[in-house]
């Protein structure tokens, strides 16, 4: 998301191992090489084991288990530890996913739940690259998200839709669209409680963008 106050600021599924170094916890990313195959086999097994559609969100779960996603979340958390304005954490990702899913249901738009959650989980995942290298976070999130989506077994068409939503979540031209792009844009902005934010006066978001209502 285009964060409050800094709009212009410029590894398979098996294990996430934890080691301790001099009293501090550090993450050792597992090998990414077989991740895509493992994720796809997991989804296949779920589908075979149940008559209900447990497989619906298997790839979204695989995103959260992906070592690159987890590593990025840790980096963002560390870099935003002293941040005054809105942060880009898992709570925000899930807020966006749930708001987008609610609107999708209320309006009967028919957008895939898995694609909504995938886009929400990935839309800010490149935030640390903006802080570290000056890459706009929407562009960085498309770069990282593309790799993660491929590893998690998303089809080419689904990947295209999800990456479009990630890349357009700061573009106001997507605001009124009735597709995945529009859902993610509106949920992203609506997830921020500007009306209760103590840093609101120092935030450089426009009045049009600030969320001052319970929705």
Labelled PLM ranges:
Residues 1-215:
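Metal-dependent phosphohydrolase cores
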């Amino acid at each position: 998301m285009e964060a409050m106050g800094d709009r212009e600021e410029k590894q398979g599924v098996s294990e996430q191992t934890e080691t301790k170094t001099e009293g501090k916890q550090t993450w050792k990313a597992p090998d990414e090489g077989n991740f895509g195959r493992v994720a796809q086999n997991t989804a296949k097994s779920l589908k075979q084991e149940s008559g209900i559609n447990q497989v619906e969100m298997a790839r979204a779960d695989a995103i959260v288990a992906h070592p690159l996603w987890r590593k990025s979340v840790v980096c963002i958390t560390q870099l935003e530890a002293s941040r005054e304005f809105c942060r880009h954490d898992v709570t925000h990702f899930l807020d966006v996913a749930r708001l987008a899913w609610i609107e999708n249901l209320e309006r009967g738009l028919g957008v895939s739940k898995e694609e909504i959650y995938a886009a929400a989980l990935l839309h800010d995942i490149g935030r640390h690259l903006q802080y570290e290298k000056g890459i706009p976070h929407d562009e960085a999130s498309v770069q990282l998200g593309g790799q993660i989506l491929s590893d998690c077994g998303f089809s080419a068409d689904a990947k295209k839709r999800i990456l479009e939503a990630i890349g357009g979540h700061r573009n106001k031209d997507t605001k009124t669209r009735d597709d995945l792009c529009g859902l993610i844009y509106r949920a992203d902005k609506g997830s921020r409680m500007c009306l209760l934010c103590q840093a609101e006066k120092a935030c450089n978001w426009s009045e049009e963008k600030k969320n001052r209502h319970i929705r």
